């Protein structure tokens, strides 16, 4: 008897060998300079060797100017990280697994000692600058050979702060004036 989850699936222009996915989790094993560590590579390789079709190794920092709520995560905010990120891709591809890079920004959720309720609302220029950082990070993911990207939109981090009416009290085009407005950030 064949199980559907063991059959290949096409996602966009990618064919994933099965429907078993290993999704992102914080591991806190990258180097202190935000570069990919040997532990990161070993982790991806062990997950891929287990037979998953697609894996997301975890949150990748797109903006080093914001304090990280998740210490020791890999950076994707500078070209110097591309060689290490490429090693993650090769570790997954060695076992015919696809790999997506999760692009992440903490927003007001951080360990800086600042209460998230007191963080100033981003200006439109700041929003555009952060959007540009996401675009640059996506280009680095592709340069490293990643099979795709995932835009981190949960757990109260920056993207979630735009799409959730619990966080988003803006009155401009990024607020909740119309249902599509909060999605403008993405």
Write out the residue ranges for each language-model feature.
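Flavin-dependent oxidoreductase catalytic cores
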Residues: 1-186
């Amino acid at each position: 008897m064949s199980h559907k989850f063991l059959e290949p699936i096409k996602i966009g222009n990618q064919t994933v060998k099965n429907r078993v996915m290993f999704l992102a989790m914080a591991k806190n094993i990258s180097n202190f300079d935000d570069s990919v560590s040997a532990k990161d590579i070993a982790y991806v390789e062990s997950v891929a060797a287990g037979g998953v079709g697609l894996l997301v190794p975890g949150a990748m920092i797109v903006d080093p100017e914001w304090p990280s709520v998740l210490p020791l995560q890999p950076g994707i905010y500078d070209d110097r990280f591309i060689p290490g990120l490429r090693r993650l891709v090769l570790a997954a591809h060695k076992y015919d697994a696809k790999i997506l890079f999760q692009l992440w920004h903490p927003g007001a959720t951080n360990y800086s000692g600042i209460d998230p309720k007191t963080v100033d609302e981003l200006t439109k220029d700041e929003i555009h600058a952060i959007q540009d950082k996401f675009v640059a990070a996506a280009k680095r993911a592709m340069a490293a050979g990643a099979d795709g990207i995932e835009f981190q939109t949960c757990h109260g981090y920056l993207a979630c702060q735009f799409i959730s009416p619990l966080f988003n009290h803006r009155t401009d085009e990024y607020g909740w004036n119309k249902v599509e407005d909060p999605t403008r950030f993405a």
